[in-house]
C-alpha cells in the first residue's frame, strides 16, 4: 500500500507518524540545487513501479509507503538519478535523489 500526495514541505496534521511510514526528500542536481518538476517514481524491491509524483518547484517529494526496500527514481530534462531507502518502520525517512 503506497500513495503519493500533493507535494510540499509540511505534512498534513492528520498524519500519525507513529503509524505511517513517510519517505520524503528532494531532487537535486550535481551542485545540490533543487530540481523542480521532476517525475519521482517509487519502485519496490523487485524494481516494479509502485507510484509516481511530480516534485514541487523546490524539488520536494513525498510518498507514504510500507517498511521495506524502495528505489526512488527521478526523471527530468536536467538528468536522471536513483536513490535507495530502507525504512524499517513508521516515521519520516529522508533521502535526496541526485540527478546527473
Curated annotation (Swiss-Prot):
Q: Which InterPro entries does the UniProt entry name for this protein?
A: CarboxyPept-like_regulatory, DUF1416
> Where is the Isoglutamyl lysine isopeptide (Lys-Gln) (interchain with Q-Cter in protein Pup) crosslink found in the sequence?
98
Q: Which domain of life is it from?
A: Bacteria
Q: Name one Pfam family in it.
A: DUF1416
Ribonucleoprotein as UniProt keyword:
no
- What are the record's GO terms for cellular component? peptidoglycan-based cell wall; plasma membrane
Entry keyword Ubl conjugation: yes
Q: Keywords assigned by UniProt?
A: Isopeptide bond, Ubl conjugation
Check the record and name the SUPFAM superfamilies matching this protein: Carboxypeptidase regulatory domain-like
More details: Pupylation of this protein has been demonstrated, however it is unknown if it is the product of this gene, of the identical gene Rv3118 (AC P0CG96), or of both of them.
Name of the protein described by the UniProt record? Uncharacterized protein Rv0814c
Write down the species: Mycobacterium tuberculosis (strain ATCC 25618 / H37Rv)
Amino acid at each position: 500500500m503506497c500513495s503519493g500526495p500533493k507535494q510540499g514541505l509540511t505534512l498534513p496534521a492528520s498524519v500519525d507518524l507513529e503509524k505511517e511510514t513517510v519517505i520524503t526528500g528532494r531532487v537535486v542536481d550535481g551542485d545540490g540545487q533543487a530540481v523542480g518538476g521532476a517525475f519521482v517514481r517509487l519502485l519496490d524491491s523487485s524494481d516494479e513501479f509502485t507510484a509516481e509524483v511530480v516534485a514541487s518547484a523546490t524539488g520536494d517529494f513525498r510518498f507514504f509507503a510500507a517498511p521495506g526496500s524502495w528505489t526512488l527514481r527521478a526523471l527530468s530534462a536536467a538528468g536522471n538519478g536513483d536513490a535507495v531507502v530502507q525504512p524499517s518502520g513508521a516515521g519520516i525517512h529522508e533521502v535526496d535523489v541526485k540527478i546527473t
